């Protein structure tokens, strides 16, 4: 399978894929198949700005699981799979599941609040918002080790620096150009939600680790069965990675060199990720 402890990820036949990442891919694919072969459109689960006022809590928490078509699903999975797998291997399977729920709901509330004024009839679905959130989360942490992603030398006296912290915004603009029907607001709120995660502003919304450990103990038989085909990253093991070890940079680079760069280039900014917006039904 893929070794997500390295970047770019490398194929390792001895590894099984992360449980949550694999399950999300399979589950959303099945939903896409159901939508394609039946007349059910999941209309009630499209996120519209009025969802909080209408108390449509299902759309606020589940809109990201559904897609317009297979192409939309493939694009989102291609964007999300690697960062989600990296996050899961470092933070634990259940912790990652809680994170996805928090990112989904927080981004949805931002989208709805602003949308009531600027795009009241525009709905969104899809996983790209979460993808942009994880992108911004990683961009924030990567910026501590590699503040500048790339420097473009336009002439002897002119150069443009692409700061790692701003990469998600660049990606969002590129998506807007390549896919005009995509939701720029959705992507931007995915990015801001990723920053909230990065700066620790939503940490208090997580359940205590003891609760997660208790759940894992009660589901131990099911977890042992799943580990025949996937890797389940348990809370006790992941606490070490999240706590004492800290963030491990994706790109191979000397940490002291990265720290020196960070000091010389000043403070960091924001990063993030999301997806599609349209007239009546957009893709996030």
UniProtKB/Swiss-Prot annotation:
Identify the GO cellular component terms for this protein.
Golgi membrane; nuclear periphery
**Gene3D superfamilies, sorted:** Rhomboid-like (1.20.1540.10)
Name the domain of life.
Answer: Eukaryota
- Spell out the SUPFAM superfamilies in the cross-references: Rhomboid-like
- Say which family it is in: Belongs to the peptidase S54 family.
Key words, A-Z: Golgi apparatus, Hydrolase, Membrane, Protease, Serine protease, Transmembrane, Transmembrane helix
Q: Which InterPro entries match?
A: Peptidase_S54_rhomboid_dom, Rhomboid-like_sf
- Look up the EC number in the record and give it: 3.4.21.105
Location(s), subcellular: Golgi apparatus membrane; Golgi apparatus, cis-Golgi network membrane
Which processes are annotated in GO (biological process)?
Answer: proteolysis
Its function?
Answer: Probable rhomboid-type serine protease that catalyzes intramembrane proteolysis.
Catalytic function, reaction form = Cleaves type-1 transmembrane domains using a catalytic dyad composed of serine and histidine that are contributed by different transmembrane domains
The terms under GO molecular function for this entry are: serine-type endopeptidase activity
Designated gene of the protein = RBD2
Q: Which residues cross the membrane?
A: 17-37, 66-86, 98-118, 124-141, 160-180, 182-202
Protein name per its UniProtKB record: Rhomboid-type serine protease 2
What is this entry's stated membrane topology?
A: Multi-pass membrane protein
Enumerate the active-site residues.
128, 187
User: Which cysteine residues pair off into disulfide bonds?
Assistant: none
Signal peptide range: none
Please tell me which top-level EC class this enzyme sits in.
hydrolase
């Amino acid at each position: 399978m893929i070794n997500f402890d390295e970047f770019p990820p490398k194929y390792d036949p001895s590894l099984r894929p992360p449980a949550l990442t694999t399950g999300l891919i399979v589950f959303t694919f099945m939903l896409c198949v159901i939508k394609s072969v039946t007349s059910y459109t999941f209309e009630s689960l499209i996120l519209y700005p009025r969802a909080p006022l209408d108390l449509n809590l299902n759309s606020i928490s589940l809109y990201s699981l559904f897609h317009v078509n297979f192409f939309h699903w493939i694009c989102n999975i291609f964007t999300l799979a690697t960062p989600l797998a990296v996050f899961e291997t470092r933070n634990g399977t259940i912790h990652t599941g809680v994170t996805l729920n928090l990112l989904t709901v927080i981004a949805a509330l931002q989208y709805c609040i602003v949308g009531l004024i600027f795009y009241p009839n525009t709905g969104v679905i899809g996983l790209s918002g979460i993808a942009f959130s994880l992108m911004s989360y990683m961009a924030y942490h990567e910026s501590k080790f590699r503040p500048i992603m790339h420097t473009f030398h336009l002439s002897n006296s002119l150069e443009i620096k692409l700061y790692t912290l701003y990469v998600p915004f660049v990606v969002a603009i590129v998506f807007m150009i390549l896919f005009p029907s995509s939701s720029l607001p959705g992507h931007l709120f995915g990015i801001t939600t990723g920053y909230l995660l990065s700066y620790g502003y939503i940490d208090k919304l997580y359940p205590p680790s003891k609760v997660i450990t208790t759940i894992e103990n009660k589901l131990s038989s099911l977890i042992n069965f799943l580990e025949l085909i996937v890797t389940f990253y348990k809370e006790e093991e992941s606490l070490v990675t999240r706590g004492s070890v800290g963030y491990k940079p994706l790109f191979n680079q000397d940490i002291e060199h990265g720290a020196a760069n960070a000091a010389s280039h000043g403070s960091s900014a924001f990063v993030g990720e999301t997806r599609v917006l349209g007239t009546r039904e957009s893709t996030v």
